[in-house]
């Protein structure tokens, strides 16, 4: 029992220490120009505020919002993480907490089918940009998405952009990663994603 108590305290300390310099953002205290386009991604170290861009990628944003409103992303792993480059999540089939399939994670589907790539509108993939992931083929976007942690100009016209992080990017920079692999064992998870206005 004593060992368990020490372990629990140690785990709590590590989590608190990991998030020590991350400012937690309260979206209710921020005035947004277009609050209907704001999604709040909650992770271990706090809130990440995403502004969605339906005029740039209407189909992609619609799919994302549909999944957010159904709470499909809750407790889904950040299964692919490249330090200082990107975090990827959204495998609804093989990435759910308590039911992860490490052999298949990253290949799962939402059950809604794929959608077409939206890559014709100009978009600068600056740090914090949010986009839908796909296979090596275009028009295979579904539920998985990624957020870049640095500027990625070569992603323009390659991936469907759906928005950009406007607050809280620091919380994503604390997501667990592995030095020798892009795919993470015992990963961090999305707690919830909610639209600011339902």
What is each PLM-predicted segment?
Residues 1-198:
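Cyclophilin-like peptidyl-prolyl cis-trans isomerases
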């Amino acid at each position: 029992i004593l060992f368990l108590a020490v372990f629990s305290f140690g785990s709590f300390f590590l989590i608190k220490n990991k998030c020590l310099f991350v400012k937690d953002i309260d979206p209710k205290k921020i005035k947004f120009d277009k609050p209907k386009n704001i999604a709040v991604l909650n992770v271990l170290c706090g809130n990440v505020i995403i502004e969605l861009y339906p005029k740039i990628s209407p189909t992609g944003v619609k799919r994302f919002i549909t999944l957010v409103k159904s709470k499909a992303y809750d407790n889904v792993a950040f299964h692919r993480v490249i330090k200082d480059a990107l975090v990827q999540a959204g495998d609804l089939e093989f990435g759910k907490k308590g039911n992860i399939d490490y052999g298949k994670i990253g290949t799962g589907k939402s059950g809604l089918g794929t959608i077409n790539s939206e890559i014709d509108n100009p978009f600068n993939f600056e740090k914090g940009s949010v986009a839908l992931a796909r296979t090596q083929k275009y028009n295979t976007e579904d539920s998985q998405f990624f957020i870049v942690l640095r500027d990625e100009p070569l992603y323009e016209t390659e991936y469907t952009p759906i928005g950009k992080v406007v607050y809280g990017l620091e919380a994503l920079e604390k997501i667990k990663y592995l030095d020798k692999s892009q795919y993470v064992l015992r990963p961090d998870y999305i707690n919830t994603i909610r639209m600011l206005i339902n």
